[in-house]
């Protein structure tokens, strides 16, 4: 919730026309996000934070594409990925032609965000730097992102910036 609120502060709350949307798998974080919205005077009808797995059970399918997406997904977590062949037909992942490996979901989160992004929108996703250099399917997904000019820029961040991890991170900005 704090990342959504920070984005609204930068954009100006008056520019958040449709409201705040999100999805969180961790029930504690989900509840904290909702509480944070109330504590910052966001009316209940101005946010829709769903509980569930973003990659295997995405919410907000019926909503229009988003003009701004911010995300700080968990770094290098496991997911069904290439262990579930049906996911290659998912419209979020199919364009790249391959799935992120089941041992590392980083690029699956990036493809998910890209699929929800409006044509003139911008997404900023905090990532583990490994997404820049790992091979195999991840290299093919990166190539897809580059070939289609989706990557606007990459911002390298210092280590010890985020609570709970000492690793350096980066922000991938998609357009």
PLM regions and their residue ranges:
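Catalytic core segments in nucleotide and nucleic-acid processing enzymes
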Residues: 86-90, 100-103
């Amino acid at each position: 919730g704090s990342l959504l609120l920070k984005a609204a502060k930068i954009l100006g709350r008056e520019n958040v026309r449709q409201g705040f949307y999100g999805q969180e798998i961790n029930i504690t974080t989900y509840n904290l996000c909702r509480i944070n919205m109330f504590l910052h005077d966001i009316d209940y009808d101005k946010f829709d934070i769903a509980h569930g797995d973003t990659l295997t059970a995405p919410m907000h399918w019926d909503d229009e594409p988003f003009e701004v997406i911010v995300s700080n997904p968990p770094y290098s977590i496991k997911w069904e990925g290439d262990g579930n062949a049906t996911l290659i037909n998912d419209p979020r992942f199919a364009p790249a032609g391959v799935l992120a490996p089941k041992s590392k979901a980083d690029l699956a989160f990036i493809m998910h965000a890209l699929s929800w992004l409006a044509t003139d929108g911008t997404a900023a996703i905090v990532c583990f730097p490994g997404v820049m250099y790992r091979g195999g399917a991840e290299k093919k997904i990166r190539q897809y992102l580059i070939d289609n000019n989706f990557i606007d820029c990459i911002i390298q961040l210092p280590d010890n910036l985020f609570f709970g991890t000492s690793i350096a991170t980066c922000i991938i900005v998609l357009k």
